[in-house]
């Protein structure tokens, strides 16, 4: 069931190139002409540009500006954007929400620009305040918070500071009007524990809007809200509970939620209200950090804000890639499923901090309704270049099989967001492990947030796997019991100590199964044996990840093979995939009265295309894939 979290239509694209450091080489444009991406992410339009654009520092990483001078960079980006428009693509640029590079002691970067004679009034108007320290994150004593990244000192603008937002609005206007950029990806969506007056005033108002003074006292141990001040530890984002903090867990959670809500309000003001007023079809994304299902910049954000009116949800996975030898192949596909669910089925992107598994990285994005390969496009490397061109041409040729689609998943794995909102992140570890089990066993599953449990959503699936019961509401437990009454299995963790009493009524049901976290065999056997009519099965290596989608009169199944010869050598030439063969498929059809007319295997690699031999037995379809290297798509056509 397609979800909606937009005031307008959702955008879709899956041919996407992203570079953080800019590529000024004309050969890059030639590569793009050949690869034909729909969207290119490159360029800087926020505080970074105005901090380093007029200095030699801008030529180094991470910006690698191709020319020097703010006006010169804007002109270069305008020309580049036009070149991409000419070949049918769009360009989205980077925009820092907080960090502005510069050393306050040496008066470099943003400080040199703001404090000196080089402030670009002709672009940004008069300075909104006299001093930078009236724009940025502050310590409780009023001093600026100063950090370091890429060897550069930085300060961070405050999302609750109206003057910082005003400056950002002007930067967005310049980017759109001057450079004709097609969208933005926000960077550094952080709160470093700001305790400025704006944050204190906004946080007090935030609490009063949600709680009575009596509740504020009893829940958060705040006697006098008027005199309460943030202490530099509260509200950090990304962040999590500090068990040694003197503050109650509830206050720590509320402070993080406040920070993340403030960031979203800041984001909406500059990009949606300002940016989309100038360009209604502006493509909007945000670059956040998830690792493997860890705490991130939206971990306690209100549900209704999560990805609202955004198009692209980028989450970096970190540099850890996992190894086949250690039983880790493509586990971060679980991240993509999580993002797709929490965002309301927006475009999920993984920022992979490695440039070796180019084909697998593109393929996993394509297989999860997103654009692949969020970082490190090795366009100068012959193997990397070929991978992008081959896969993009494949996605372009068979675009109709990618979008629009509905999920064909048979099982839902419930993400325990309500537990997180109560300060308990232990169930997330359960979610990670069970998610890996299900992927290894080739169970067709979606992620379902516990906040989205409803009759409509439950009815999409033949089985439900819970990772936490302690934070379920009574109505949710009733819905799950009604679901089990329809002979659908519900799996719950064996250790449910501390769960509300009404959970006992749920677990007493004959179709509710208590399974220990580490009992992988029982988990899979319950799904295969207790789901009426069984589940689809796939006879292939555990290193293959499988997703399936439904279109009108068609089922589309994606296969991504992560198996490879692993070595210490990097680069696309060392991806070294190991082909799989004789993949047996036993697909359960949703309607046994429908007749299959054709089954076709497609791939950007040999054998490219094969018409498969198949056999339909009532609601079961049997076929075999002879061979596949990294990525393959099976298209099953159904008679009307």
Task: Tell me what each language-model feature is.
Residues 18-34, 58-89, 165-168, 265-269:
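Aromatic- and glycine-enriched glycan-recognition loops and surfaces
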Residues 19-22, 42-44, 51, 93-97, ...:
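A cross-domain feature marking catalytic cores of carbohydrate-active enzymes
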Residues 31, 98, 107-109, 116-329:
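Polysaccharide-binding and catalytic clefts of secreted carbohydrate-active enzymes
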Residues 33-76, 99-109, 192-202, 300-301, ...:
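Aromatic-lined carbohydrate-binding/catalytic grooves of carbohydrate-active enzymes
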Residues 245, 265-269, 273-295, 306-640:
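Carbohydrate-binding surfaces of carbohydrate-active enzymes
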């Amino acid at each position: 069931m397609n979800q909606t979290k937009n005031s307008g239509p959702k955008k879709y694209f899956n041919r996407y190139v992203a570079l953080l450091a800019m590529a000024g080489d004309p050969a890059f444009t030639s590569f793009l002409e050949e690869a034909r991406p729909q969207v290119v992410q490159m360029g800087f339009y926020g505080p970074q540009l105005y901090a380093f654009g007029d200095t030699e520092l801008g030529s180094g990483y991470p910006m690698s500006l191709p020319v020097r001078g703010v006006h010169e960079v804007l002109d270069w980006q305008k020309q580049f954007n036009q070149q991409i428009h000419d070949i049918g693509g769009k360009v989205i640029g980077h925009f820092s929400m907080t960090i502005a590079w510069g050393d306050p002691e040496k008066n470099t970067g943003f400080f040199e620009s703001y404090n000196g004679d080089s402030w670009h009034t002709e672009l940004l108007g008069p300075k909104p305040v006299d001093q930078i320290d009236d724009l940025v994150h502050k310590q409780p004593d009023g001093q600026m918070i100063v950090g370091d990244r890429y060897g550069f000192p930085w300060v961070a603008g405050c999302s609750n500071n109206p003057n910082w937002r005003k400056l950002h609005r002007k930067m967005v206007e310049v980017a759109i009007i001057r450079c004709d950029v097609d969208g933005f990806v926000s960077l550094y969506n952080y709160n470093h524990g700001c305790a400025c007056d704006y944050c204190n005033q906004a946080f007090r108002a935030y609490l009063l809007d949600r709680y009575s003074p009596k509740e504020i006292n009893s829940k958060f141990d705040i006697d006098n809200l008027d005199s309460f001040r943030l202490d530099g530890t509260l509200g950090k984002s990304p962040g999590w509970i500090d068990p040694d903090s003197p503050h109650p867990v509830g206050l720590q959670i509320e402070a993080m939620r406040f920070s993340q809500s403030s960031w979203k309000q800041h984001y909406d003001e500059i990009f949606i209200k300002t940016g989309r007023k100038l360009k209604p079809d502006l493509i909007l994304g945000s670059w956040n950090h998830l690792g493997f299902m860890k705490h991130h910049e939206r971990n306690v954000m209100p549900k209704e804000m999560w990805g609202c009116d955004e198009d692209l949800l980028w989450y970096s996975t970190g540099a850890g890639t996992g190894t086949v030898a250690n039983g880790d192949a493509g586990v971060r596909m679980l991240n993509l499923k999580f993002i797709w669910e929490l965002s309301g089925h927006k475009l999920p992107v993984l920022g992979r901090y490695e440039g070796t598994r180019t084909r697998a990285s593109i393929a996993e994005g394509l297989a999860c309704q997103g654009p692949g390969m969020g970082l490190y496009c090795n366009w100068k490397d012959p193997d990397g270049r070929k991978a992008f061109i081959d896969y993009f041409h494949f996605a372009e040729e068979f675009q109709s099989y990618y979008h629009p689609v509905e999920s064909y998943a048979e099982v839902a794995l419930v993400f325990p967001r309500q537990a997180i909102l109560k300060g308990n992140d232990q169930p997330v570890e359960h979610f990670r492990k069970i998610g890996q089990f299900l992927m290894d066993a080739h169970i067709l599953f979606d992620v379902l947030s516990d906040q989205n449990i409803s009759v409509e959503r439950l009815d999409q699936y033949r089985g439900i796997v819970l990772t936490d019961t302690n934070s379920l509401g009574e109505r949710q437990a009733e819905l799950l019991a009604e679901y089990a009454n329809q002979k659908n299995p519900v799996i719950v963790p064996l250790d449910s100590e501390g769960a509300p009493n009404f959970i006992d009524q749920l677990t007493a049901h004959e179709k509710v199964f208590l399974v220990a976290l580490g009992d992988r065999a029982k988990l899979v056997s319950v799904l295969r044996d207790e789901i009426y009519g069984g589940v689809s099965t796939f006879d292939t290596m555990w290193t293959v990840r499988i997703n399936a989608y439904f279109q009108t009169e068609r089922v589309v199944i994606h296969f991504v093979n992560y198996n490879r010869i692993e070595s210490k050598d990097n680069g696309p030439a060392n991806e070294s995939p190991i082909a799989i063969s004789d993949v047996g498929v036993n697909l359960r059809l949703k309607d046994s009265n429908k007749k299959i007319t054709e089954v076709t295997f497609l791939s950007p690699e040999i054998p490219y295309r094969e018409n498969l031999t198949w056999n339909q037995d009532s609601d079961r379809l049997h076929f075999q894939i002879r061979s596949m290297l990294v990525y393959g798509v099976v298209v099953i056509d159904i008679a009307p």
